[in-house]
Protein backbone atom coordinates (compact mmCIF):
# COMPACT_ATOMS: atom_id res chain seq x y z
CA UNK A 1 0.00 0.00 0.00
CA UNK A 2 2.81 2.44 0.85
CA UNK A 3 4.54 1.77 -2.46
CA UNK A 4 1.32 1.99 -4.49
CA UNK A 5 0.46 5.29 -2.75
CA UNK A 6 3.87 6.71 -3.73
CA UNK A 7 4.97 7.16 -0.11
CA UNK A 8 8.39 5.52 -0.51
CA UNK A 9 9.10 6.59 -4.09
CA UNK A 10 10.98 4.42 -6.56
CA UNK A 11 12.64 1.45 -4.86
CA UNK A 12 16.28 0.74 -5.67
CA UNK A 13 17.14 -1.70 -2.89
CA UNK A 14 15.28 -4.47 -1.05
CA UNK A 15 16.44 -6.53 1.93
CA UNK A 16 14.70 -9.79 2.85
CA UNK A 17 15.92 -11.79 5.84
CA UNK A 18 15.14 -14.61 8.23
CA UNK A 19 16.72 -16.14 11.31
CA UNK A 20 16.33 -19.57 9.68
CA UNK A 21 17.68 -22.17 9.66
CA UNK A 22 16.44 -23.18 13.09
CA UNK A 23 17.13 -26.82 12.13
CA UNK A 24 20.52 -28.50 11.56
CA UNK A 25 22.05 -27.26 8.32
CA UNK A 26 25.54 -27.48 6.89
CA UNK A 27 26.21 -30.86 8.47
CA UNK A 28 26.83 -34.31 6.97
CA UNK A 29 23.96 -36.65 6.15
CA UNK A 30 22.92 -38.49 9.32
CA UNK A 31 23.67 -42.17 9.62
CA UNK A 32 20.87 -44.65 10.14
CA UNK A 33 20.14 -44.93 13.85
CA UNK A 34 17.64 -47.78 13.84
CA UNK A 35 14.68 -45.44 14.39
CA UNK A 36 11.32 -46.98 13.59
CA UNK A 37 9.14 -45.41 10.91
CA UNK A 38 6.20 -43.71 12.68
CA UNK A 39 2.83 -45.37 12.25
CA UNK A 40 0.96 -43.91 9.31
CA UNK A 41 4.08 -42.66 7.50
CA UNK A 42 4.90 -44.29 4.17
CA UNK A 43 8.65 -43.63 4.21
CA UNK A 44 9.22 -44.72 0.59
CA UNK A 45 6.44 -42.41 -0.58
CA UNK A 46 7.85 -39.56 1.55
CA UNK A 47 11.29 -40.02 -0.04
CA UNK A 48 9.82 -39.83 -3.53
CA UNK A 49 12.59 -39.66 -6.15
CA UNK A 50 15.27 -38.82 -3.54
CA UNK A 51 17.96 -41.40 -2.74
CA UNK A 52 16.55 -44.32 -0.76
CA UNK A 53 17.80 -44.27 2.83
CA UNK A 54 16.74 -45.89 6.07
CA UNK A 55 14.36 -43.87 8.20
CA UNK A 56 15.95 -41.81 10.97
CA UNK A 57 14.52 -39.29 13.42
CA UNK A 58 17.30 -36.95 12.29
CA UNK A 59 15.23 -36.15 9.16
CA UNK A 60 11.61 -36.49 10.09
CA UNK A 61 9.36 -34.73 10.96
CA UNK A 62 11.18 -31.36 10.65
CA UNK A 63 14.92 -31.37 9.97
CA UNK A 64 14.78 -32.70 6.38
CA UNK A 65 14.96 -29.06 5.22
CA UNK A 66 18.73 -28.99 5.72
CA UNK A 67 19.74 -31.50 3.02
CA UNK A 68 19.42 -30.88 -0.72
CA UNK A 69 17.98 -34.33 -1.44
CA UNK A 70 14.91 -33.55 0.67
CA UNK A 71 14.71 -29.79 1.22
CA UNK A 72 15.85 -26.41 -0.02
CA UNK A 73 17.47 -24.87 3.06
CA UNK A 74 16.40 -21.57 4.58
CA UNK A 75 15.98 -19.83 1.23
CA UNK A 76 13.49 -22.38 -0.09
CA UNK A 77 11.77 -22.79 3.26
CA UNK A 78 11.14 -19.11 4.04
CA UNK A 79 12.09 -17.23 0.88
CA UNK A 80 8.89 -18.18 -0.91
CA UNK A 81 6.88 -16.44 1.81
CA UNK A 82 9.04 -13.36 2.35
CA UNK A 83 10.30 -12.63 -1.18
CA UNK A 84 6.72 -12.76 -2.46
CA UNK A 85 6.07 -9.30 -0.93
CA UNK A 86 8.58 -7.33 -3.06
CA UNK A 87 7.90 -9.50 -6.13
CA UNK A 88 4.21 -8.65 -6.08
CA UNK A 89 4.65 -5.06 -4.92
CA UNK A 90 7.33 -4.11 -7.46
CA UNK A 91 6.17 -6.33 -10.33
CA UNK A 92 9.47 -8.23 -10.46
CA UNK A 93 10.25 -10.96 -12.97
CA UNK A 94 13.46 -12.95 -13.55
CA UNK A 95 16.68 -11.39 -12.22
CA UNK A 96 19.35 -10.17 -14.66
CA UNK A 97 22.15 -11.40 -12.40
CA UNK A 98 22.53 -13.39 -9.17
CA UNK A 99 25.48 -13.57 -6.78
CA UNK A 100 25.67 -15.79 -3.70
CA UNK A 101 27.94 -16.23 -0.72
CA UNK A 102 27.46 -18.97 1.87
CA UNK A 103 28.73 -19.61 5.38
CA UNK A 104 31.63 -21.96 5.96
CA UNK A 105 31.24 -25.13 8.02
CA UNK A 106 33.94 -26.20 10.46
CA UNK A 107 33.49 -29.72 11.86
CA UNK A 108 36.94 -29.70 13.48
CA UNK A 109 39.00 -26.76 14.68
CA UNK A 110 40.72 -24.88 11.80
CA UNK A 111 39.46 -27.47 9.36
CA UNK A 112 36.80 -26.22 6.93
CA UNK A 113 34.53 -28.92 5.59
CA UNK A 114 32.84 -29.12 2.22
CA UNK A 115 29.50 -30.87 2.62
CA UNK A 116 27.80 -30.79 -0.80
CA UNK A 117 24.74 -32.74 0.35
CA UNK A 118 23.94 -30.22 3.08
CA UNK A 119 22.43 -26.77 2.65
CA UNK A 120 24.72 -23.97 3.92
CA UNK A 121 24.41 -22.71 7.51
CA UNK A 122 23.95 -19.16 6.22
CA UNK A 123 23.71 -17.39 2.90
CA UNK A 124 23.64 -13.98 1.32
CA UNK A 125 22.11 -13.83 -2.16
CA UNK A 126 22.03 -10.65 -4.27
CA UNK A 127 19.59 -10.49 -7.18
CA UNK A 128 19.71 -7.66 -9.73
CA UNK A 129 16.42 -6.80 -11.45
CA UNK A 130 15.65 -4.51 -14.35
CA UNK A 131 13.18 -1.67 -13.94
CA UNK A 132 9.55 -2.79 -14.12
CA UNK A 133 6.25 -1.28 -15.17
CA UNK A 134 5.60 -0.55 -11.49
CA UNK A 135 9.12 0.59 -10.50
CA UNK A 136 10.98 2.67 -13.09
CA UNK A 137 14.54 2.04 -11.84
CA UNK A 138 16.67 -1.11 -11.44
CA UNK A 139 16.36 -2.98 -8.14
CA UNK A 140 18.95 -4.83 -6.09
CA UNK A 141 17.42 -7.42 -3.75
CA UNK A 142 19.43 -9.05 -0.97
CA UNK A 143 18.31 -12.27 0.70
CA UNK A 144 19.98 -12.95 4.07
CA UNK A 145 19.62 -16.03 6.29
CA UNK A 146 21.40 -17.87 9.06
CA UNK A 147 21.46 -14.86 11.37
CA UNK A 148 22.79 -12.36 8.82
CA UNK A 149 20.89 -9.10 9.17
CA UNK A 150 20.66 -6.08 6.87
CA UNK A 151 22.42 -2.82 7.71
CA UNK A 152 20.36 -0.66 10.05
CA UNK A 153 19.05 2.37 8.10
CA UNK A 154 20.01 5.80 9.44
CA UNK A 155 16.35 6.88 9.48
CA UNK A 156 15.38 4.12 11.93
CA UNK A 157 16.52 4.61 15.55
CA UNK A 158 19.32 2.20 16.48
CA UNK A 159 17.28 0.64 19.29
CA UNK A 160 14.30 -0.13 17.00
CA UNK A 161 14.07 -3.70 15.79
CA UNK A 162 14.02 -4.55 12.10
CA UNK A 163 11.18 -6.93 11.35
CA UNK A 164 9.19 -9.22 13.57
CA UNK A 165 11.11 -9.70 16.82
CA UNK A 166 9.38 -13.01 17.58
CA UNK A 167 10.60 -14.67 14.37
CA UNK A 168 13.43 -12.40 13.18
CA UNK A 169 11.99 -12.21 9.66
CA UNK A 170 11.73 -9.03 7.67
CA UNK A 171 11.34 -7.22 4.37
CA UNK A 172 12.70 -3.70 3.92
CA UNK A 173 12.27 -1.72 0.71
CA UNK A 174 14.53 1.34 0.36
CA UNK A 175 12.90 4.03 -1.76
CA UNK A 176 13.75 7.49 -3.04
CA UNK A 177 11.53 9.18 -0.42
What is each model feature region?
Residues 34-177:
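Glycine-rich, aromatic-lined ligand/substrate-binding cores of catalytic
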Residues 1-45:
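A contiguous active-site-proximal alpha/beta segment in oxidoreductase catalytic domains
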Amino acid sequence: EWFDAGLIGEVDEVFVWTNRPVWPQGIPVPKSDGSQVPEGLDWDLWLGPAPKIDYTNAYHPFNWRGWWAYGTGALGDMGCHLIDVPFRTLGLHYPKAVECSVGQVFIKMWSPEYIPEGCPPSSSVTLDFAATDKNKIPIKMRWLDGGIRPPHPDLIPANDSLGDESSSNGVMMIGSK
